[in-house]
């Protein structure tokens, strides 16, 4: 995420500036994708939407090591911090968990784009701090759109569904060892 940020961040910030100006002027918000859109729907609970991984582990994992780390990561995930999972499970250098880590944000962003395009979720007009908890972040960033908050909840649920098969594979991998 951070590697490509130098390329896409200026574009997203310009789109956000246009949204912010339109919101202040009381005109139609022009851009769906902007910096807060990515924060709200692509990096919820941290890069890779790892809050979905925490939920999947707590429900489906039989690995005590994964469950212990997931329990420690819950308060961090609430504030979009996922380093305990990235380095504790680890996700780094773990092909089983790296795959959903890359897929979940893309699927979530595509879903959120659709929900915004059809008018269910409001467009982003406020750049809430990245540590703002999920649901509240979407609500604030969209200028009070309940649809954006609901969309963010659905995006986390989608991430859980994406992570489940990989958590089950990790269970089987431990059994094989």
Predicted regions: what is each one?
Residues 1-174:
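Pore-lining transmembrane helices
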């Amino acid at each position: 995420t951070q590697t490509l940020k130098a390329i896409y961040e200026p574009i997203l910030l310009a789109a956000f500036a246009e949204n912010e100006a339109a919101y202040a002027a009381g005109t139609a918000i022009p851009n769906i994708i902007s910096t807060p859109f990515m924060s709200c729907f692509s990096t919820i609970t941290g890069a890779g939407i790892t809050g979905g991984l925490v939920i999947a582990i707590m429900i489906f994992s039989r690995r005590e090591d994964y469950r212990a780390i997931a329990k420690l990561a819950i308060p961090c995930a609430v504030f979009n911090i996922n380093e305990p999972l990235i380095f504790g499970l680890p996700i780094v250098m773990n092909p089983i968990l790296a795959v959903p880590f890359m897929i979940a944000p893309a699927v979530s962003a595509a879903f959120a784009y659709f929900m915004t395009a059809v008018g269910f979720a409001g467009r982003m007009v406020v750049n809430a701090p990245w540590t703002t908890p999920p649901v509240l972040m979407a609500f604030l960033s969209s200028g009070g759109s309940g649809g954006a908050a609901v969309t963010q909840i659905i995006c986390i649920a989608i991430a859980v569904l994406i992570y489940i098969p990989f958590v089950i594979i990790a269970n089987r991998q431990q059994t094989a060892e």
